[in-house]
Amino acid sequence: MANEKKVAREPSFLLALVPIVAMIGFMLYCFLGHSESGYHDAHMPLVMSIVVACIVGHFCGHDFKDMLSGMIERLSASMEAVLILCTVGFLVASFMASGAIPSLIVYGLDLLTPKLFLPVGCILCAIVGMACGSSWTTTATIGLAFLGIGAGLGINPALTAGMIISGAYVGDKFSPLSDTTNLAAAVAETGLFDHVTAMVSSTGPTLVIALILYTIMGLNIDASAYDPTVAQSIQDAFRGAFVISPVLLIPIIVVIVMCILRVPGLVGIAISVATATIFMMIFQSTDIYGSRALGDIFNTLHYGIGVETGNEVADSILGKAKGMDGTMWTINLILLALLSLIHISEPTRQAEIS
């Protein structure tokens, strides 16, 4: 009888809430209670909630070895999303180094006219958001440029800001490079491109309605107040650092084609990275990525590029392409979030309590 395995019991409602309360408490401590401490990330509160959840599970009769096995089993189901996020870092770096994103921005800014500033600006923010996979990056970079252009046209800053945020978030949600898009697909245990396609039915009509309204409002803008120097300075900065060509948009087209064909995420991104890397070696100066030596190419994909143009907006965009190294913060957060919210609570049945 001594070798019989102890039967675990179901935790009470209050006991099941302990890990959640602990996580909230540690987050409040880090973000509000002791802001002078210098730690403002969510990682350690999640780690502490995992520790508390393990203690609660052990108190209810679960063996630590069984809990660990349960975590590993459930974590393996999410590894594809984590691997995709790693390769997304390669994709962002290769797109930037190849000149794909700079070319996209340069040609997009050519489309700006006073009457179409609002709808075209929204579309450009969506495109840039898709290309770089970050609504915040889009808002903080080209979005700031559009605020300056909008001010020159005499447009209400709140309206311009709404246009920027609308486009940036639409682009972020449709982007296979976005960390939140990958996280949503991982939590839902669905394919990345399936998740992106599923959002078209809800986000697509919303974008169309917004563009119609922006077009109507744009027709009332005074075209004589338009100052093209802000957009021109960004274009000149990119042209000075990169070779700009329509051909360099091909890597971005490859991603779109992979999404339409519903190619598995890892395969589609790998093909796009290979395409962009080849274009980088053919078209761009070695000043951008060091040399054609394999080590420098690996360095670019891992850590990104360090190009400076002298233009604040352009440099901010370029600075976001940090390669795989730039995705590690998000990957760590995703793993800890999955462990604390799913992989601990499910094996110990804490998630079943209501």
For each feature predicted by the language model, list its residue ranges.
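Juxtamembrane/transmembrane-helix interface segments of polytopic membrane transporters
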Residues: 93, 214-218, 222, 276, ...
